[in-house]
Swiss-Prot record:
Organism: Yarrowia lipolytica (strain CLIB 122 / E 150)
Protein's name in the database: Flap endonuclease 1
Entry-linked PROSITE patterns: XPG_1
Family as reported in the entry's similarity comment: Belongs to the XPG/RAD2 endonuclease family. FEN1 subfamily.
Compositionally biased region (Basic residues): 377-389
Organism domain of life: Eukaryota
Name of the gene this protein is made from: FEN1
Amino acid sequence: MGIKGLNKLLMEHCPAALRSSEIKNFGGRKVAIDASMSLYQFVIAVRQADGQQLTNENGETTSHLMGMFYRTLRMVDNGIKPVYVFDGKPPVLKSGELAKRKERREEALKKIEELKQQVEDGEEGEETKEAQEDVTRFEKRTVRVTPEQNDEAKKLLTLMGIPIVEAPCEAEAQCAKLAEAGKVYAAASEDMDTLCFGSPVLLRHLTFSEAKKMPISEINFAKILEGLEMTHAQFIDLCILLGCDYADTIRGVGPQTALKLMKEHGSLEKIVEHIEKNPSGKLKVPENWPYQEVRALLQAPDVLDSSSCDIKWNNPDVEGLVDFLVRDKGFSEDRVRAGAARLMKQVKVKPQARLDGFFKVMPKEGGEKRKADDKKTKGKKPATKKAKK
């Protein structure tokens, strides 16, 4: 879910930190991708014309594999070197959010049964059609990625020669730390809390389908801190105040109020102190609000040491891909072999240095110094050499 209202707040207060881009602009870049988030997207979005998930002749869901195979090929075709990072065990602090998601899923399942009955009882017409569309919409709310689908995705990526990392906890935190350590250029996730973990660059919409025509959003963390005039620690406090997956926020505090409070007080401790000194005010701090525990988790997440992550891109196992995708999962052999050929082609291509690696922006001080030197010499006659006798 990420941080409530953060993207809109950044667009308003530090627009220089965000820019829209095309996938081709990241050629030559290594990117750590939140695999768990991507799989969830694929299971929801990769569907048949009637809205049902893709399945093989045995009735096994293949939406996750179809999405993973073709979206990864698209990135590789554009010169991107992806690293997929998978979730480990969720942190204890996230249990409340997971319970809420389970409750919403159960409510959606009940609604689906009601709507299906409505479709069965109704006559052909606009109302029945709308009810069927509602069934599809609510079914998407019940989607979850199973452990088996996770394992199949890992197997597919390994056969494709794409490196994977299994995080001990949150995938987006591991992605952020790989980027922070310089192992990759950016972290790619839809979760804005990736920024809290310190990723220098966050890419959103990277794994969306080309048909959506959704530009990739590139978010620069240093420019966020500069635009908001905050430290990393203060930014984390702001995000906790906005609301995240690990704790509820203070009721009545929206994005603008959260920013105002942080500007005025500078930390959550001082904000809590301010609110508690004004018991007659509108704002009330939740009982046993675990903001300090959440802050500690965001500042020091449970991740693998980046130096221990062995990230290597290998040749695809063509026959292994055919066995798995064609014989086991019912994919088209021609398409799978064509995809493997695309992977092999990119493995053989020698990486080209990016132009932005050749040029360095000169600091303003240099320009100022030159101007000052020009003023000193202005009006002076050039020195002349004496003629040799």
